[in-house]
Design a protein with these regions (language model features):
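A positional/architectural concept
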Residues: 1-41
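Charge/polar-rich, low-complexity and marginally structured segments
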Residues: 42-155, 161, 175
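Short, intrinsically disordered C-terminal tails of secreted or membrane-associated proteins
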Residues: 169-174
């Protein structure tokens, strides 16, 4: 998830002096990462507001084709998570959220969804300068509205057009 660099310090580890980023992570956890290998460890700048909107756009799309075999699907999603690409992580959140609504998830996929969502939330909190609760609600609303848009059966009487609003269809009575 997202953290904040609070300091850069020189430390001697195994008789070698190095510069370290001191990162403060959620839950007041501090992590030291050598500055020389920061990129290799996936350290990057937090996304900006424009990129945050692109993340929300990914959440608002229909799910992408997923492997039917849960083991292969799990590995594919794990690779997306490990990539550190925020858009790939948003893809995992959306796809697993849709699958959870339709068929439910295995214990492993539930945990993956939780972890992916936490990564998204932690990044969007910084990008949007919002609270965790606000961002969680934003993500949930976006997923619910996109699920309703792409998965609502056209044969239903009422259809959720967007989060919180219902559009009733006119059905003529031939009686």
């Amino acid at each position: 998830g997202a953290g904040r660099i609070v300091a850069i310090e020189e430390r001697e580890v195994m008789e070698e002096k190095q510069s370290y980023y001191i990162l403060e992570m959620p839950g007041e956890v501090k992590v030291m990462i050598p500055t020389a290998t920061a990129e290799e460890h996936g350290i990057r700048s937090v996304i900006n507001k424009e990129e945050a909107q692109k993340v929300m756009s990914v959440l608002g799309q229909d799910e992408t084709e997923m492997e039917k075999n849960w083991n292969k699907r799990y590995r594919e999603n794990m690779d997306k998570m490990k990539s550190g690409n925020i858009y790939e992580i948003a893809d995992v959140v959306r796809n697993l959220s849709f699958k959870q609504k339709e068929k439910g998830l295995s214990t492993g996929e539930k945990k993956m969804l939780y972890n992916a969502k936490q990564i998204l939330v932690s990044e969007l909190v910084f990008a949007e300068n919002s609270t965790q609760n606000e961002v969680e609600e934003l993500i949930d609303n976006k997923i619910n509205s996109s699920y309703a848009m792409f998965r609502t059966d056209e044969g239903e009487i009422g259809k959720v057009a967007s989060a919180g609003s219902i559009v009733n269809k006119f059905i003529p009575f031939n009686g």
